[in-house]
UniProtKB/Swiss-Prot annotation:
NCBIfam families: PRK11783.1 (NF008748). Its main location: cytoplasm. GO terms for molecular function: 23S rRNA (guanine(2445)-N(2))-methyltransferase activity; RNA binding; rRNA (guanine-N7-)-methyltransferase activity. This is Ribosomal RNA large subunit methyltransferase K/L. One of its GO terms (cellular component) is cytoplasm. Its EC number is 2.1.1.173, 2.1.1.264. Residues 55-167 form the THUMP domain. Pfam families: Methyltrans_SAM, RlmL_1st, THUMP, UPF0020. Belongs to the methyltransferase superfamily. RlmKL family.
Length: 722
């Protein structure tokens, strides 16, 4: 017989153990001391204490952060599975249950446990219980894995086994109000820990508004409201593991329930702060409303279906708290990074001075919010290591950057180019400031000898060298380009890390989609009220066609309440403008996975979720032939030529534009508008289209001032049904 220590509870003296998510131990310690627990000891994910039965009951009813509350029953030596059976067989189970009592056994093992299989260890304990009752002349008690009358827990660490009664019966995160969870619901006890560590409970008088801008099913808001209203988290539960325990003190438990009801009634009568939640997913918002009603807090918490981009502050002070998407998969990380950037930008713009707390899994992405974090806590959401970061939103800084023309003497061989470049700068910088434009062209092959274009993107400059005519010596062209580049740097006083150079040449087939280098570095720029990611290094084009600026701005102005379709959508910039303009939905179709991912990042950067803004990977002509939806506005900006092996087709804009536009017009709703643009310099629109549709040439008005020197930068038409 193995050594056995009887630690069965004596009257008014019990040993309890609370299990919890890693990082919540100190919060539980404070709770236990508030319940009059003594000799509190913290472990890794555990809190042990001594106290009366009342302290255990209070922990079950009031602990917001614990997962389970265990009552220590016995401790014994374990050198094999047989020792588990022998100690179970000799234990006096009658003090806790009868043969009519349903029961369950859980088992956990430390890494150095002398037994190697938790399920088999639990089975040996179960066998000992059953055989004990049979030995005593009773019938065999029944095992019930879900909500048994009593649940026992055995933990083996090294060669020491400890037997517990699970007072909670099932995890205490099950408050009883959750009707449905989202894709990855946050457990209630972890949510409560996030709220507590955010500092809001102590600051709530100074922070009269609590907003979760990505509220999911509302767990953070519900837990915060329960804290404020002094609502016991276990009050709505109808199951605990002690209700059929033979030593259960029903009078004590009823007294604690009555006290909790009285405290809740008093809490609900207080003057409440504002609790608001928002989410872009209407299905999730519906679940949140159901949970809030189930929790009895629908009078105090309001949730609405709205994307992050529409967030605004209802009061001067408050707190934004959220558990945003993590982006655990590599393909989602960049999209999540842009969502965090949007959250930070919106926070600085509309919530300056507000407290903020975000719970994320990747600490490297915390920088994306651009918040000076004051505190950081390491917590675990299941097995995922996470960080809770808290701070205050600083006021959004005005973009103080401005291009300045330096008063420098350029070398004689650069005079011709320098004079024209400075003249253009004066003209277009003044124009851009007046029109609130930050990305524009300032030189477009104005001089035949200097065959390049120069674009300004915020504080970066993008220089493109074009292949010289065959009549020009390549070495001479190269020298001229270097002369111009030197002059550009001197006139604008540029650091080398702000200048990006590309050599343009005719792209064939998939070449237009190929990377120009190995590194991918994105920069954020603004156009109107939209923000976009541009890449100056890795692809021939940056991700933002500057000559289409007027078209995109028009789409934004005219999209309120409309369904928008973007064919050959590239990086989705027109779709984002439509969304910012209040489009009911956007659909962006492109055959390139790279550009569709880029589109999704652009949407995230602007604070839009994917619910009403879908991306479709498809050949546009094939997709149009199968599509059945109608759209109010359609933008068609196809390539001049593409040879796509995956689609097994060659596209030629001159040859195929009748088929393309005819199919697209079938998807145009009555009274709708289709805008067609092409940059094929020798393009001729087939006259048959004008016979079939109401066609208007808007090329001149669609070309902005900074591209007016090149009348064939693109052609553009409006199409309407006759």
């Amino acid at each position: 017989m193995c050594d056995k220590k009887d630690v069965s509870p004596q009257k008014d003296q019990y040993t309890f153990l609370a299990n919890c998510a890693l990082g919540l131990e100190e919060l539980i310690e404070a709770e236990i001391k508030g319940f009059s627990g003594v000799e509190v000891e913290l472990g890794k994910g555990t809190v042990q204490w001594q106290g009366s039965l009342e302290t255990g009951y209070r922990a079950c009813l009031w602990s917001r952060f614990s997962s389970r509350i265990l009552l220590k029953l016995s401790q014994f030596e374990v050198n094999s599975e047989d020792d588990l059976y022998q100690n179970s067989f000799t234990y006096d189970w009658h003090q806790h249950m009868s043969w009519k009592t349903t029961f369950a056994i859980d088992c956990t093992l430390s890494a150095d446990a002398t037994v190697g299989h938790s399920q088999f260890a639990a089975l040996r304990i179960k066998d000992g219980i059953v055989d004990r009752f049979k030995e005593d002349g009773d019938e065999r008690p029944s095992v019930k894995t879900t909500q048994p009358d009593v649940r026992f827990h055995i933990h083996v660490s090294g060669n020491e086994g400890t037997l517990y009664l699970d007072l909670s019966g099932e995890s205490l995160h099950k408050r009883g109000y959750r009707v449905a969870g989202g894709m990855a619901p946050l457990k209630e006890n972890l949510a409560a820990g996030i709220v507590a560590l955010s500092g809001w409970p102590e600051k709530q008088e100074a922070l009269p508004s609590l907003i979760d801008p990505m509220c999911g099913t509302g767990t953070l808001l519900i837990e915060a409201a329960m804290m404020f209203g002094d609502v016991a988290p276990g009050l709505a539960r109808n199951y605990f593991g002690f209700l059929h325990w033979h030593q259960h003190d029903s009078q004590l438990w009823q007294a604690l329930l009555d006290e909790a009801v009285a405290r809740e009634d008093a809490g609900l009568d207080k003057t409440w702060p504002s609790f608001q939640g928002y989410d872009a997913d209407p299905v999730v918002v519906s679940s949140a409303r159901k949970n809030i009603i189930r929790a009895g807090l629908d009078e105090f918490i309001q949730v609405k279906c709205s994307p992050l981009v529409h967030l605004g502050a209802p009061t001067d002070r408050g707190m934004l708290i959220c558990n945003p998407p993590y982006g655990e998969r590599l393909s989602e990380t960049e999209k999540v990074r842009q969502l965090y950037a949007a959250f930070g930008r919106i926070g600085r713009k509309h919530f300056a001075g507000w407290d903020v707390a975000v719970f994320i899994s990747n600490p490297d992405l915390a920088e994306s919010f651009r918040v000076s974090w004051e505190k950081k806590y390491r917590l675990f959401n299941g097995t995922i290591a996470c960080r809770l970061s808290t701070g205050v939103f600083a006021e959004e800084e005005e973009n103080s950057f401005a291009w300045e023309i330096q008063q420098v003497e350029v070398q004689e061989d650069a005079l011709q180019f320098a004079n024209r470049f400075k003249k253009n700068l004066k003209k277009y910088l003044k124009w851009a400031k007046k029109e609130n434009i930050s990305c524009f062209r300032v030189y477009d092959r104005d001089l035949q000898e200097f065959n390049l274009s120069v674009d300004l993107y915020e504080k970066w400059i993008h220089v493109q060298e074009y292949l010289p005519p065959k009549t020009i010596d390549p070495d001479l062209a190269s020298r001229r380009f270097n002369i111009a580049l030197r002059a550009i740097r001197e006139i604008l006083g540029l650091r080398s890390d702000r200048v990006f150079i590309k050599k343009r040449q005719r792209q064939k087939g998939a070449g237009q989609y190929q990377q120009q280098g190995d590194r991918k570095k994105m920069h954020q720029v603004r156009e109107g009220n939209c923000y976009f990611l541009v890449n100056f290094r890795d692809y021939l084009d940056t991700g933002l066609f500057l000559d289409h600026r007027p078209i995109r701005l028009r789409i934004g102005r005219e999209s309120l309440g409309k369904k928008f379709l973007n064919l050959y959508g590239y990086t989705g910039t027109a779709s984002v403008h439509a969304a910012q303009g209040g489009a009911a939905s956007t659909t962006t179709v492109d055959l390139s996975s790279t550009y569709l991912q880029w589109t999704e990042m652009n949407f995230s950067l602007n604070g839009f979720a994917e619910n009403n803004h879908r991306t479709v990977k498809a050949d546009c002509i094939k997709w149009l032939a199968e599509e059945t939806e109608l759209y109010d506005t359609i933008f068609v900006d196809p390539p001049t030529f593409s040879n796509t092996q995956k689609a097994n087709r060659v596209f030629d804009i001159q040859r195929d534009h009748i088929q393309l536009l005819t199919l697209a017009m079938r998807r145009l709703s009555p009274g709708g508008l289709l805008i067609f643009s092409t940059n094929f310099r020798r393009f001729i629109l087939d006259e048959k289209l004008a016979e079939q549709f109401d066609v208007k040439d808007i090329t001149r008005e669609s070309i902005p001032l900074d591209f007016s020197r090149n009348e064939k930068i693109h052609f553009c038409w409006e199409f309407r049904q006759k």
